[in-house]
Curated annotation (Swiss-Prot):
NCBIfam families: trpB (TIGR00263). Pathway: Amino-acid biosynthesis; L-tryptophan biosynthesis; L-tryptophan from chorismate: step 5/5. Keywords: Amino-acid biosynthesis, Aromatic amino acid biosynthesis, Lyase, Pyridoxal phosphate, Tryptophan biosynthesis. The gene is trpB. The keyword ATP-binding does not apply. Belongs to the TrpB family. The modification N6-(pyridoxal phosphate)lysine is found at residue 87. This is Tryptophan synthase beta chain. It is an enzyme of class 4 (lyase).
Length: 397
């Protein structure tokens, strides 16, 4: 099928979906391309971001974490956004697109529940009926977010098949959409999946990097040495990276979850430790067995527990423009505790992975003068029970 925009990033991406979904993807691409050129759409989107979601978000300098080093560390505060994470940015854009296409229903999948909450709030705001697929395991470990979604009128559907996590929720959501796309829009939650989703999600998240660039220039008079973001599917990271890709002096660092350690096999780091395959409508690196079955991913953080990754990250990795590293559960937990204790900010476990890598860079070379920005993609309210139980079991509280 011919497309208006390039569906590939190098060899990665594409539209590997059943023929029945092609018209829906084509309609979505057409709506997106026309909306990008429509001043009225852009004005409404900008107004919602400012007056409903609370943009621009702050860029906060860490006062205490960097003590004894020559690192200057800033946090891009997506945790302050209405809804509690960066997810709100792009769902407002997609919900406006759904209305533009005349859709009345929203289908979404969610892992940590943050995208579910964002989808529910955007649907409530814009008068759309919303149903959200969520792995049964995630329903258990993210109960506050499940209640928030239901409170805002969304139907939450637990998925018991497979590993009962995000990848299974994705499969169910796609299955639903293939039978209901005439009236429903599939609100994909990350910069992955079939074209045009990776491009749409990037464009509806790119204000993260645009704001960061303007804010750091104002505060420091120069661009950062590196911007750092966690990578599951990759939407918060691509939102941060997009405006810096052409700034070749700025390092782009994506942080995948190493879970219990890469060597344990229990991780979610397909970029560095997976193989290219086709899953979830796209060609990208993924965790798979020797005979091509999708393997279970694992992370303490539900939002990073995904066996593949967005195609633009795969491309940035293949060209060397971005570096991808991994952080274990324990390292992320330590960063979670450190930021809470020393800066009075409780981060999401997802964002704690990015912070942990920044702290590692700082501690490995305390004499190095460096300016780092971490995308604090979400707040940690949803994770306090998980962390409490772990710390209690360890006798730390």
């Amino acid at each position: 099928m011919s497309t208006l925009l390039n569906p590939y990033f190098g060899e990665f991406g594409g539209m590997y979906v059943p023929q029945i979904l092609m018209p829906a993807l084509r309609q979505l691409e057409e709506a997106f391309v026309s909306a990008q050129k429509d001043p009225a759409f852009q004005a409404e989107f900008t107004d919602l971001l400012k007056n409903y979601a609370g943009r621009p978000t702050a860029l906060t300098k860490c006062r205490n974490l960097t003590e004894g080093t020559r690192t200057t560390l800033y946090l891009k505060r997506e945790d302050l956004l209405h809804g509690g994470a960066h997810k709100t940015n792009q769902v407002l854009g997609q919900a406006l697109l759904a209305k533009r296409m005349g859709k009345t229903e929203i289908i979404a999948e969610t892992g940590a529940g943050q995208h579910g909450v964002a989808s529910a709030l955007a649907s409530a705001l814009l008068g759309l009926k919303c149903r959200i697929y969520m792995g049964a395991k995630d329903v258990e470990r993210q109960s506050p977010n499940v209640f928030r979604m239901r409170l805002m009128g969304a139907e939450v559907i637990p998925v018991h098949s497979g590993s009962a996590t995000l990848k299974d929720a994705c499969n169910e959501a796609l299955r639903d959409w293939s039978g209901s796309y005439e009236k429903a829009h599939y609100m994909l939650g990350t910069a992955a999946g079939p074209h045009p989703f990776p491009t749409i999600v990037r464009e509806f998240q790119r204000m993260i990097g645009e704001e960061t660039k303007a804010q750091i220039l104002e505060k420091e008079g120069r661009l950062p040495d590196a911007v750092i973001a966690c990578v599951g599917g990759g939407s918060n990271a691509i939102g941060m990276f997009a405006d810096f890709i052409d700034e070749t002096n700025v390092g782009l660092i994506g942080v995948e979850p190493a879970g219990h350690g890469i060597e344990s096999g229990e991780h979610g780091a397909p970029l560095k430790h997976g193989r290219v395959g086709i899953y979830f409508g796209m060609k990208s690196p993924m965790m798979q067995t020797a005979d091509g079955q999708i393997e279970e991913s694992y992370s303490i953080s539900a939002g990073l527990d995904f066996p593949s990754v967005g195609p633009q990250h795969a491309f940035l990795n293949s060209t060397g423009r971005a570096d991808y590293v991994s952080i274990t559960d324990d390292e992320a937990l330590d960063a979670f505790k450190a930021l809470s204790r020393h800066e009075g900010i409780i981060p999401a476990l997802e964002s704690s992975h990015a912070l942990a890598h920044a702290l590692k860079m700082m501690r490995e070379n305390p004499e190095k003068e460096q300016l780092l920005v971490v995308n604090l993609s979400g707040r940690g309210d949803k994770d306090i029970f998980t962390v409490h139980d772990i710390l209690k079991a360890r006798g730390e509280i």
